[in-house]
Amino acid sequence: MKTTFSFLSLFLTLFLNAQDFSTTWLKEVAPRNIGPGGMSGRITSIDVVVSNPNIIYVGTASGGLWKSTSGGVTWNPIFNDQVTASVGSVAIQQSNPDVIWVGTGEGNPRNSLNGGYGIFKSINGGKTWKSMGLKNTRNIHRVIIDPSNPNTVYVAAIGSPWGDHPERGIYKTVNGGKSWKKILYVNPKTGAADLVMDPKNSNKLLAAMWEHKRDPWFFKSGGKGSGLYVSFDGG
């Protein structure tokens, strides 16, 4: 085996020395990315403009929010100037796609979790952003806009996984984010893991509540607070 390896090494050395690997042609080539791929963290949320599917928004765990107007061929970061780079949810107001809501703080309670700073809103397709409150929720997993009344927005805040956290649950605004009301709260150990709206009845909501706690050395999932909740009157 050793003899074979030595022979192959000698052969490759002689072969490479015999070749004329000119790098002159590289002078005419523009700089380019040959890998590895740039990382923006885990993708946590995607939304698409229904009337123009080429416009896509992608939220990431630690790399902010990205926008494509070319159906995904090219991407631009549009959230870099904000206080947090962790996005848990992005929602487009389909009746006016220039209005974008972003819930910050990744909703997946990993040990490498990044915290957020509430919910943000853009009225110009992501060119500028305004903080709309809920800064203490830490981690938002879902934002839902009522298609029949875009001033009504729901937020599922899973909250911090590291301990008791009262700023979690389901929140609702009926005035475009000027004020918020907590409409579902179980206990300080239980956050809103997800929220869905009936597409035929915006007053019907289903919320998945999850009791959990993460520590550096273990993860506790489940408890008395966990369960599925339904509302037929908008919370």
Predicted regions and their residues:
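Bacterial Sec-dependent N-terminal signal peptides
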Residues: 1-21
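Beta-propeller blade termini and top-face loops
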Residues: 19-235
